[in-house]
């Protein structure tokens, strides 16, 4: 895959510990490297979000999450795979394979394989990313680059331009083990 110059620049920034904003399927997102503790805590501070709530990981394809699936029943993997890429987020057991600054106080972690072209390009270059709505706590998620700038006044390392994917609502969130819908889409 040949990535655009701006996506390559965003990948370099993320590898260096940046927190960036980028368009997703429905709203603008904030993202960073999930393994970079400083970057994740900076993102949480920007949002005024407590670490115990946990965060979503977004990827280019299901294989980027293979390290989590070693002991999963095959039907779980098939269930997720049949809904990806797309607006479906699954809560899956993390088996202590992810840091607590990603999982919060939960035994599960939220995973999604995006169908947004820029998000997929970016994840193809850097692997799974933290992806959370671009807004300070209690405010509506940004639906425009202007709103991103108004919310964060230059506190982000980069804003990756582009268009939203056209969805009206964020992804549905389901518990993989129970099938329960935790958040409708």
UniProtKB/Swiss-Prot annotation:
Keyword terms: ATP-binding, Cytoplasm, Nucleotide-binding, Nucleotidyltransferase, Transferase, tRNA processing
Catalytic activity: L-threonine + hydrogencarbonate + ATP = L-threonylcarbamoyladenylate + diphosphate + H2O
GO CC entries: cytoplasm
Signal sequence extent: none
UniProt-annotated location(s): Cytoplasm
InterPro entries named in the record: DHBP_synth_RibB-like_a/b_dom, Sua5-like_dom, TC-AMP_synthase, TC-AMP_synthase_SUA5
Chief localization: cytoplasm
EC number: 2.7.7.87
YrdC-like domain mapped to chain residues: 4-185
Function: Required for the formation of a threonylcarbamoyl group on adenosine at position 37 (t(6)A37) in tRNAs that read codons beginning with adenine. Catalyzes the conversion of L-threonine, HCO(3)(-)/CO(2) and ATP to give threonylcarbamoyl-AMP (TC-AMP) as the acyladenylate intermediate, with the release of diphosphate.
Family classification: Belongs to the SUA5 family. TsaC subfamily.
This protein's name: Threonylcarbamoyl-AMP synthase
Organism encoding this protein: Pseudomonas putida (strain W619)
